[in-house]
Swiss-Prot record:
Known function: Phosphorylation of dTMP to form dTDP in both de novo and salvage pathways of dTTP synthesis.
PROSITE patterns: THYMIDYLATE_KINASE
GO annotations of cellular component type: cytosol
NCBIfam families in alphabetical order: DTMP_kinase
Record GO terms (molecular function): ATP binding; dTMP kinase activity
Positions annotated to bind ATP: 10-17
Organism of derivation: Synechococcus sp. (strain CC9902)
Catalytic EC class: transferase
Reaction catalysed by this enzyme: dTMP + ATP = dTDP + ADP
Pfam annotation, one family: Thymidylate_kin
Protein name: Thymidylate kinase
Lineage, uppermost ranks: Bacteria, Bacillati, Cyanobacteriota, Cyanophyceae, Synechococcales
């Protein structure tokens, strides 16, 4: 595969979506990508038509249809398998670049550390869903839990976002462990939007050039 796979990850409210939009404009003009490559911007869950249906089940489910924690884990794995098989891997094989809002690390952080599910089981499911595909760069956007909650104050929450402070703190701790284990780029996301954009641009240049 000749394309590149870039992931932004972190707890809710870390600024991923804003920076994805920035990088979607910056990357094609940066000189990093071959002139023949396209940039595919995507997300998890919901990066495919099937995945969008799974996203609705995961995040916006009616009270009488909430999945169990095991069913939730398997739905995330199904979303990822479809995403890798039909979007990410084909794009990389074409030589295109893929920029994703979340990937496998989020499942370990949220379902493993947040929910307390067996992390070895999650890792095995990750291997099945991704068939060994790993990002060329994962940037973890670091913000304290209090900052995340403050940024999202007053916004409508999905089912996962509504889990509360203690859950989010466990997830944040999980991301910190994973970032060390998997050698992710760790980026202070408390900076201004423009400064954070500059740091991400430099990180991409240093890693992918």
């Amino acid at each position: 595969m000749t394309g590149r796979f870039i992931v932004l990850d972190g707890i809710d409210g870390c600024g991923k979506s804003t920076q994805i939009r920035h990088l979607a404009q910056w990357l094609p003009a940066s000189g990093l990508m071959p002139s023949t490559a396209q940039l595919i911007c995507t997300r998890e869950p919901g990066g495919t038509p099937l995945g969008q249906s799974i996203r609705e089940l995961l995040l916006h489910t009616e009270a009488d249809q909430v999945p169990s924690v095991t069913a939730e884990l398997l739905l995330y794995a199904a979303d990822r398998a479809q995403h890798v098989d039909t979007v990410i891997r084909p794009a990389l094989l074409r030589g295109d670049w893929v920029l994703s809002d979340r990937f496998a690390g989020s499942t370990l952080a949220y379902q493993g550390y947040g929910r307390g599910l067996d992390r070895q089981l999650i890792t095995r499911l990750e291997s099945i869903a991704t068939t060994g595909l790993e990002p060329d760069l994962t940037a973890w956007l670091m913000v304290p839990v209090e900052v995340s909650l403050q940024r999202r104050h007053g916004e409508k929450e999905d089912r996962i976002e509504a889990e509360g402070r203690a859950f989010l703190r466990r997830v944040a701790d999980g991301f910190a462990v994973l970032a060390e284990q998997r050698n992710w780029s760790q980026i202070d996301a408390q900076q201004s939007v423009s400064k954070l954009s500059q740091v991400l641009e430099q990180t991409l240049r240093e890693t992918l050039q």
